[in-house]
């Protein structure tokens, strides 16, 4: 165990206050919260990645000074008007390209360095809006895309998983602007493939580079290893490392990436083997490697090994830095060992190692998880007094803790405190507060916050739309919920992952006997071409209609579905046949049966087996529903 000091006068006021109040160390099991989800990262939550830079190109993160774009960026006022003007035009006309281009041509927007990136960023998750603007800008006289614009577009298309379009874009660059192609462009692509868990495609980038005039070098290969390790594909990275040792001479960076990858997934034996390989290759571990090992031990619950390693570092001449202590504090906070986390914080100050934003954020998260929000504010005030600007994640921990306690006014007060130190709430903060407002029935406040968010130049993403739609629907504001859903579709944000929201909205609207409104929502999806409709989407729509008593409409849409070459799921067919039998509607039943029989024959399926499977599925679902209702009644007694 570390030799923790008892002398309190040497430490910060926050340490003195917290450690002098023994009553704050309550039994950890009394408190459960969602913050376990936030601590999955070894060094910091992914929510902080945008605010940190990579050290030596590996997985460890280091804090950069925070600068609020609106107050520190001298170009903000210069760009703001044109960015908003372009964004509003894109929202209004993006599905009608001729009108869109005409509106942009007549907008008076002057293309200049930096503006395109700002507009692309303003489009947020609506990548198709950004792509429309990118295409229009390329057609303008006396303008040529810069490498930064191309890189931004590659990131946007990759985030949408439009990798074919990405390669097409790079091919276009090769033909029209070959001088702009640089290795960093392929690094961006490698990172996106890795984040999408497309390991083979990420590796294939190395083979594609020569076609564009570049041979992969040690830097690009190192970025590939780093990306694979960062996103959990460390086994593939280790195999690739062995396969490529003759092609790319080993260096410390490669070993550090592998070490981070194994520690990240808790494979400490493999991590130790990397140390052996490192030593055999003539490299000594540095402070970053030691920090990765500390993180691995701590997150595996092996705190004794972590403390031993900390002492060993000092013996070897490596004085632990803020990152070293922070990974220990994060791991302790994660398992509710807050008293021990505070002792590590004390030890940190005893060795005159200054805590950074990540350290303070770890303490904030722990106290929030522990249910002591008042202590979070003490930590927050202390870090601000020391000149440290809290990060988005720092505020997010406190905001979510308030949400859990349904303290809406406290959320608004915290947002105001953020503004007072010139720190404007981001999308994540707005998501939490809007969700709580809807939950508490404060619909007007939710709408006000939404409008405020857009006025501040923030683009609602998929999560924000889903929160708003679900919240409005739960409060009976069905027209507003439907309007927001259609707006989400219009902005190109609707995809298969939002089918749950579609199902909830359709069922809620139909339950309220608003058939035309439900049809309008469905029509919006089909007419806008927002998402390639599949069997699941049709099933959601048909089941919603049928379950709410609209049998005729359900059958009509089923026939339309079949005509689009989608075969109904067996239980859908069985449900329709059962309903039509009760209604004595033999005409509809015969038409649907004949069409499905033909589809089964085309697919070389047994129609009898198909029918039997449908009846079985329907029976099992009915039984499952009865069991749930029975258990619910028992609990209510």
Swiss-Prot record:
Q: What is this protein called?
A: Putative pentatricopeptide repeat-containing protein At5g65820
Q: Where is the composition biased (Basic and acidic residues)?
A: 616-630
Q: Which UniProt keywords apply?
A: Repeat
Q: PPR repeat boundaries?
A: 146-180, 182-216, 217-247, 251-285, 286-320, 321-355, 356-390, 391-425, 426-460, 461-495, 498-532, 534-568
Question: So which domain of life are we looking at?
Answer: Eukaryota
State the family it belongs to.
Belongs to the PPR family. P subfamily.
InterPro entries associated with the record: Pentatricopeptide_rpt (IPR002885), TPR-like_helical_dom_sf (IPR011990)
For this protein, the record's NCBIfam families field holds: PPR
Region: Disordered; residue ranges are: 616-637
């Amino acid at each position: 165990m570390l030799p923790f000091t008892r002398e309190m006068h040497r430490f910060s006021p926050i340490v003195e206050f917290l450690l002098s109040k023994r009553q704050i160390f309550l039994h950890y099991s009394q408190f459960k919260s969602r913050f376990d989800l936030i601590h999955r990262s070894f060094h910091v939550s992914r929510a902080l990645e945008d605010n940190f830079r990579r050290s030596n190109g590996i997985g460890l993160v280091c804090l950069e000074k925070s600068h609020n774009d609106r107050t520190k960026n001298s170009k903000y006022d210069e760009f703001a008007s044109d960015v908003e003007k372009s964004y509003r035009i894109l929202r209004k006309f993006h599905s009608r390209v001729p009108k869109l281009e005409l509106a942009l041509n007549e907008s008076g927007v002057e293309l200049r360095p930096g503006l395109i990136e700002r507009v692309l960023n303003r489009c947020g998750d609506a990548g198709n809006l950004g792509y429309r603007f990118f295409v229009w800008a390329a057609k303008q006289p006396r303008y040529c895309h810069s490498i930064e614009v191309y890189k931004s577009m590659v990131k946007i298309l990759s985030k949408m998983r439009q990798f074919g379009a990405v390669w097409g874009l790079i091919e276009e660059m090769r033909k029209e602007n070959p001088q702009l192609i640089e290795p960093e462009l392929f690094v961006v692509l490698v990172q996106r493939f890795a984040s999408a868990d497309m390991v083979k495609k990420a590796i294939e980038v190395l083979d594609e580079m020569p076609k564009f005039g570049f041979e992969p070098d040690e830097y690009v290969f190192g970025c590939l290893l780093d990306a694979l390790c960062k996103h959990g594909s460390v086994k593939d990275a280790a195999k690739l490392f062995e396969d490529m040792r003759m092609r790319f001479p080993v260096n410390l960076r490669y070993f550090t990436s592998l070490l981070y990858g194994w520690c990240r997934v808790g494979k400490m034996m493999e991590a130790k083997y990397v140390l052996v390989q490192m030593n055999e290759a003539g490299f000594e571990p540095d402070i970053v490697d030691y920090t990765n090992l500390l993180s691995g031990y701590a997150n595996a619950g092996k705190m004794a090994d972590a403390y031993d390693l900390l002492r060993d570092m000092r013996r070897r001449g490596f004085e632990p830095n803020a990152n070293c202590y922070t990974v220990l504090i994060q791991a302790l906070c994660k398992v509710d060992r807050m008293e021990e986390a505070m002792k590590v914080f004390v030890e940190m100050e005893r060795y005159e190692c200054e805590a950074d934003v990540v350290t303070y954020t770890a303490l904030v998260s722990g106290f929030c998880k522990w249910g002591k929000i008042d202590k979070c504010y003490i930590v927050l005030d202390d870090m601000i007094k020391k000149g440290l600007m809290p990060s988005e994640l720092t505020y997010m921990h406190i905001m979510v803790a308030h949400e859990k306690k349904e303290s809406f006014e406290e959320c608004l007060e915290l947002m105001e405190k953020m503004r007072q130190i010139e720190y404007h709430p981001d999308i994540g903060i707005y998501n939490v507060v809007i969700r709580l407002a809807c939950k508490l029935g404060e619909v007007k406040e939710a709408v006000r916050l939404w409008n405020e968010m857009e006025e501040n130049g923030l683009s609602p993403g998929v999560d924000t739309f889903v929160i708003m739609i679900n919240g409005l629907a739960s409060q009976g504001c069905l027209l507003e919920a439907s309007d927001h859903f259609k707006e989400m579709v219009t902005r190109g944000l609707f995809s298969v992952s939002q089918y749950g929201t579609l199902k909830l909205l359709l069922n809620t609207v139909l339950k309220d006997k608003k058939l035309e409104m439900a049809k309008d929502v469905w029509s919006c999806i089909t007419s806008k071409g927002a998402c390639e409709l599949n069997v699941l989407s049709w099933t959601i729509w048909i089941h919603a209609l049928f379950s709410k008593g609209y049998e005729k409409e359900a059958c009509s849409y089923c026939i339309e579905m079949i005509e689009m070459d989608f075969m109904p799921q067996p239980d859908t067919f069985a449900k329709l046949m059962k309903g039509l039998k009760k209604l004595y509607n033999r005409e509809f039943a015969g038409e649907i049966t004949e069409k499905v029989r033909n589809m089964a024959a085309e697919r070389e399926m047994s129609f009898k087996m198909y029918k039997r499977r449908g009846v079985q599925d329907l029976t099992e679902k009915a039984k499952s529903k009865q069991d749930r209702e029975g258990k619910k009644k028992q609990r209510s007694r």
